[in-house]
């Protein structure tokens, strides 16, 4: 009887171990979404190709480079799309997406664009929160994430920092709040939006209104 019980226990344990080993075993391997830890003082990211390369480089550094990474950015003229407009939402696949802590971000595009900003969800590729207006955040505020997009992830024309190639004071870019907070943790209006809260001051300097030239990266 003891031998039979021991064998049964071994079978149960083996099944459980197999089930548990199906998930990511280290930070980064299951990551399909992050905010960039790398920053930019201007809105010139080298266009979509430069932004995509930044996403891939950061993902590779944490062991998640074996995926197709795309920056969540809208542009008015996309060379890869016949110089037609491209919406950020059309670049990132259909989900689901998980952050670097293994936490589900959204199951699909509709769920993603129904979200509000959240400092515990919208983290960088190392799982670290982005400085913002959340309680206990270090300074300076850097929660303005460049998107060039409306709340539904489509192009906001005229707000793309010259399709992410401009560092001019004459161009602007639309940004979202990664933590979902405005000044004094205000969540009214668009301030809670993760992808379309307001425009930056201009594309020559991403800092004055609470940014650091960060972007969102998604694996397709």
What residues fall within each predicted segment?
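Bacterial N-terminal signal peptides that target proteins for export
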Residues: 1-6
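C-terminal motif of bacterial Sec signal peptides marking the signal peptidase cleavage site
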Residues: 13-16
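Secreted/extracellular ectodomain signature
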Residues: 18-220
């Amino acid at each position: 009887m003891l031998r039979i019980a021991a064998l049964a226990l071994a079978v149960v344990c083996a099944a459980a171990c197999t089930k548990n080993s199906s998930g990511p075993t280290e930070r980064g391997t299951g990551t399909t979404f992050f905010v960039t830890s790398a920053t930019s003082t201007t809105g010139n990211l080298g266009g979509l190709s430069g932004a995509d390369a930044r996403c891939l480089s950061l993902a590779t550094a944490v062991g998640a480079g074996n995926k197709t990474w795309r920056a969540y950015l809208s542009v008015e003229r996309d060379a890869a799309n016949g110089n037609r407009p491209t919406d950020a939402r059309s670049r990132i696949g259909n989900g689901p997406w998980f952050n670097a802590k293994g936490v589900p971000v959204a199951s699909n595009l509709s769920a993603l664009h129904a979200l509000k900003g959240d400092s515990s969800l919208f983290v960088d590729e190392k799982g670290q929160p982005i400085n913002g207006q959340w309680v206990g955040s270090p300074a300076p505020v850097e929660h303005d994430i460049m998107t060039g997009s409306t709340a539904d992830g489509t192009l906001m024309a005229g707000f793309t920092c010259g399709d992410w190639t401009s560092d001019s004071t004459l161009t602007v870019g639309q940004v979202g709040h990664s933590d979902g907070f405005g000044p004094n943790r205000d969540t009214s209006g668009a301030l809670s939006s993760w992808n379309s809260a307001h425009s930056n001051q201009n594309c020559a300097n991403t800092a004055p209104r609470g940014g650091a030239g960060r972007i969102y990266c998604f694996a397709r």
